[in-house]
């Protein structure tokens, strides 16, 4: 009898240690990731749009967007966690999975078709000094398909409609009106909510944003199923 009790107790301890803890909020989830050491918060706005906030562990950032006026809204979600470190959020339009082993997010259609993946981020926050204020260079990379078209970034003077295989510093100038947003022919868009000089990179390894000043990684993912749908979400 003692052996049975010991076995059951050990089984419960193992299953508890394997389950990823997270806080369910009114509009999404909050959790922490050990590698890299970041806090992750996901705020849903609609069944197809959400905000991702990442901050260094041990720091609290209350950031109010200067460009997004919409507020997170209660969304019908099914949230589950698994023993292999995955937290999955499902709405009627979108499935979002956070891998807590490496901090990456994957966005998929309800049928499981992948829309976009984050790349493992080994340098989310690099300490820097901005006019005497300690802050960070913030970076996030994504894995996009080679055959998908990416459009956006504002009104550029590069003679291109498709923004692929390029590196571009997004900073306002006299002849260009830039915006750190791209949309895909897969029917989704990504808006990088940072107002400092930001480098957009697209090559065979990644599609990424890197901003010279930021207290957090802050971006919006919008799945509208089409270009018009993404524009409507924006």
Across the structure, where does each feature detected by a protein language model lie?
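Bacterial Sec-dependent N-terminal signal peptides
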Residues: 1-23
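Short N-terminal segments immediately surrounding and downstream of signal-peptide cleavage
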Residues: 20-34
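A low-complexity, Ser/Thr/Gly/Pro-enriched, surface-exposed linker/loop concept
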Residues: 22, 26, 43-87, 125-127
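Short secondary-structure capping/turn segments at boundaries of alpha-helices and beta-strands
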Residues: 28-31, 38-41, 178-179, 208
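A short, compositionally biased micro-patch
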Residues: 34-35, 45, 82, 184
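Short, flexible beta-strand-to-coil junctions
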Residues: 34-35, 55-57, 110-111, 185
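Extended Gly/Ser/Thr-rich low-complexity repeat segments
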Residues: 39-48, 62-71, 97-111, 120
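Catalytic and substrate-binding clefts that recognize carbohydrates or anionic sugar/phosphate headgroups
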Residues: 81-234
